[in-house]
């Protein structure tokens, strides 16, 4: 009988101890969830909500992405970011032609025959335009 009492008290004691551990773990989880919710709320208040549309850079009034930044912000002198080019420069003339005009002894390494398409090697009729539809 004494053995049965001791074992019953032991089981009861271990049950109470394990129950207190479970309650403590539940309390810690609850506190952690509460902390996470408070952090999320504080972030939401700080950034005006968690929507990606609301979290964006501040832009000056009148700013449009289609104009250069120097023109969109008033009060700044215009900044030329492009490099200076020689007078008469056009990007539609080949550099070989420019060099040959400057140096009469220059010969280009390749010559495109007039009327020959460099893409397919086919002759095009005079006045041909790929943009004109007959």
UniProtKB/Swiss-Prot annotation:
Keywords: Amphibian defense peptide, Bradykinin receptor impairing toxin, Cleavage on pair of basic residues, G-protein coupled receptor impairing toxin, Hydroxylation, Secreted, Signal, Toxin. Its main location: secreted. The keyword Signal applies. Expressed by the skin glands. Expression levels in inguinal glands are much higher than in granular glands. GO terms for cellular component: extracellular region. InterPro entries: Frog_antimicrobial_propeptide. Residues 23-44, 71-82, 99-121 form a propeptide. The keyword Signal applies. It comes from the Eukaryota. The modification 4-hydroxyproline is found at residue 126. One of its GO terms (molecular function) is toxin activity. GO terms for biological process: defense response. Residues 1-22 form the signal peptide. It is found in: Secreted. Residues 24-33 have a biased composition (Basic and acidic residues). Residues 24-71 are annotated as: Disordered. Belongs to the frog skin active peptide (FSAP) family. Bradykinin-related peptide subfamily. This is Bradykinin-related peptides. It comes from Physalaemus nattereri.
């Amino acid at each position: 009988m004494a053995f049965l009492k001791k074992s019953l008290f032991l089981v009861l004691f271990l049950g109470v101890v394990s129950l207190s551990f479970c309650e403590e773990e539940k309390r810690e989880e609850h506190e952690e969830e509460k902390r996470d919710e408070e952090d999320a709320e504080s972030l939401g208040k700080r950034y005006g909500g968690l929507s990606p549309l609301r979290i964006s850079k501040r832009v000056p009034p009148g700013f449009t992405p289609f104009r250069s930044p120097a023109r969109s912000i008033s009060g700044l002198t215009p900044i030329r970011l492009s490099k200076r080019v020689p007078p008469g420069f056009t990007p539609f003339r080949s550099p070989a032609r420019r060099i040959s005009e400057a140096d009469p002894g220059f010969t280009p390494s390749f010559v495109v025959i007039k009327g020959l398409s460099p893409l397919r090697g086919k002759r095009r009729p005079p006045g041909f335009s790929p943009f004109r539809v007959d």
